[in-house]
Each structure stands twice: as structure tokens, then as C-alpha cells.
Amino acid sequence: MELAIFSKTYKGNAEEIFQKMNNQKLNYCHFNLANIGMDMIPDYIDYDKLNNLNVLLKKYNIKLIGLSGTFNMIDCDKENKEKNIRNFEILCEIANILHVKTISLCTGSKSKNSKWEWDDENETTESYNEFLETMKCLLEYAHKYNIILSIEPEASNVINSARKARNVLDHFKDEHIKIIMDAANLLNMNNYNDQDTVIIEAFDLIGNDIIEAHAKNFNISDNKIKFVAPFNGKLNYELVIKLLNKYNYKGTFVMHALEENEVDKSIKYLKENFDALY
């Protein structure tokens, strides 16, 4: 597995980001359109910016493994949710222009503060069904533009476990839906001490459906899970990488939840400790 990184890890414009990636010998990037001055899910196509991005990708030999499309799929603000659903078609068309096959999603939360913050209403049947309805809308675009939609079981979202992600896959039975495996996102204050069991069960359920794997870590601070750079936490990386290999994952390992000044140390840690990474 080669290492990759989120474009928003870096400060600067796209050319500056790709220069930094070259200096760190990183060739793969999960990209956010905000890095070229566009909305993540824009309401129009800026062909000049996209054409310039394609030129830079070729110049610096950077490959985009995915685009971010993470709006709140069960947003309490119905008008905002509907706008994002409509504009998602534009993002799919942009993905085609950039030769990107995968768009990442956030399954969402009923929290009024953040789509990444837990709300007890996430556990209701109504929230789950609302997510399914949003997913159904996005799948129409995915089919039209031949895009894979990647969902991520995340402890603060409506799809907050590998079992629920499995249920989504079984509900739709659609090759345009795949999984982002971020082991740290499976953990919460109730299960992190039993992380090996949680991670093994997750791979048993969804290990054959992984399209993208994320590399971040976690610590406990103020009785909460805090996400940190790959080199700095409690995650059993040895187990995660062993399971990615067991399930024949062929994609990249995308560094996540780190500051720009932590990238070099994260690369060093991952490459020196795990032979599967290069």
C-alpha cells in the first residue's frame, strides 16, 4: 500500500500543495475542491479552475484517489440538505472531468452543531430511513456518471458501526457503494478498550467492500475520543494493516487528522514500522 494524504492537510494553493507532496514523495491525494477556491459541493462548474488543476496534476505527477463530498445526509436543515443533493450531480460531473472515480460521503448526524457530532436521534429508525432516501438520490447521479460513493462507519454518525454499514450495502446491493475503512472512527468511549474485537468484527463484515483506507490515530482526552496524527495514539495499527492485507486491499493508506507539520513524522512512523507501506 502506498501512502496518500488529504489535500486540506496543507496550507496554500493547489500548486503549493503538490510541491509539498513531491518533496515528501507522496503521489496520491484525496482532494477537496476548497483547495482551488471552489465550494466542496459547488453549484456551478468552474472549467478554468478544473482545467488548471488537471494541468498541475500532470505537472507534479499527482493522482487523485477521491473527492470529498461530505455534506450532512440527514441534516435538520432540510433546505440545505436538498441543495446539497441537487448540487451533488455537479460534483459527479466534476469528478468525471478530473478522472476521479470515488466521492466520499458523510452519513450525517441530527446534531445542529456539526455533522461530525453525536446526537441521540441518530439511533432512530426515522434517521436511518432518511439517510437511505438521501443515498437513493445520490445513487441516481452515481449511476449516471459512473461514480463510486464511499461511506464511512463513524461513531458520531447515523451509520456508526460496521454492522450498520453492512446493512446499507445489503439494502442497496449496488456496486456503486463502497466502504471507507477508518478504524479509529469505529471507536467510542464504550468500546475503545476492546478495539481489537471491534476492528476484527468490522473487517469480517465489510472487509471485502473497502475502496479507501484512512490512517489516523486516537487518544483519550477529557473523557472523550480525540483524533490525532498516525504516529501519536493508541490505535493497533499492526492489526489494521494485517487485516487490510488479509482482505486483499489494493488501495492507498490515506493519512488524516494531522497538521501540516506532522506529515513528515507520520510518514516516517508508518514506513518504518510497517513493511506493507511504501
Residue ranges and their predicted role:
Residues 1-12:
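Boundary/entry segment of secreted carbohydrate-active catalytic domains
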Residues 2, 29, 67, 133-234:
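Acidic/histidine-rich catalytic cores of soluble enzymes
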Residues 9-11, 33-35, 71-73, 107-111, ...:
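Active-site-proximal loop/turn and secondary-structure-junction residues that shape catalytic pockets
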Residues 16-19, 58-59, 76-179:
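Active-site acidic/histidine proton-transfer and metal-coordination neighborhood
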Residues 18-25, 45-65, 89-99, 139-144, ...:
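Acidic (Asp/Glu)-rich catalytic clusters
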Residues 30-54, 107-113:
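Glycine-rich, proline-tolerant flexible connector loops at the mouths of alpha/beta enzymes
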Residues 44-51, 81-89, 121-125, 132, ...:
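Charged helix-capping and loop-helix junction motifs
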Residues 263-278:
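C-terminal helical cap(s) of enzyme catalytic domains, especially alpha/beta-barrels
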